[in-house]
Amino acid sequence: GDQDNTSGFKNGVKKLHDQMGSEHNYMLVFEDARHNIGPHPAPAASFATDFELGHYFDPSWDSETINRVIEHMSLAFLDCHVKGDTARCDYLPKRQDSQQYEGADHKYTDPWPGFPHLWASGLKFYRK
């Protein structure tokens, strides 16, 4: 997430992303999330202490939502770039910010592909 207090965001994962040279360089960011948003679900052993459990939960994001978003984006990426299914490439957002905005005409901007209307708030998708 963009509030990663372990690896850092601006001078950590974002900086690494910006320095990558791959042709298909993408990064999905959960806004206001810290470092501990994965893997999910938390293993049973982690419930023994609060310290261990803290590695698997984030105060801003529900793990079910995180899993669904990651599954959606991962499948779109793999289908597009590994399987060569170009129709699935359309599910990789073209617009960086997931937030939909209401215009002067009271109509909202389109949601990201594969997301219901007004359902993808708090995500950013970086392309390089």
Spans of model-derived segments:
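Conserved loop-alpha-helix segment in the C-terminal half of the alpha/beta-hydrolase fold
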Residues: 12-22
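Active-site-proximal beta-strand/loop segments in catalytic clefts of secreted hydrolases
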Residues: 1-3, 30-33
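Alpha/beta-hydrolase-fold serine-hydrolase catalytic core, especially in secreted/extracellular enzymes
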Residues: 22-23, 31-36, 41-128
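Short N-terminal secondary-structure initiator segments
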Residues: 1-7, 121
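Conserved alpha/beta-hydrolase "acid-adjacent" motif
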Residues: 5-12, 38
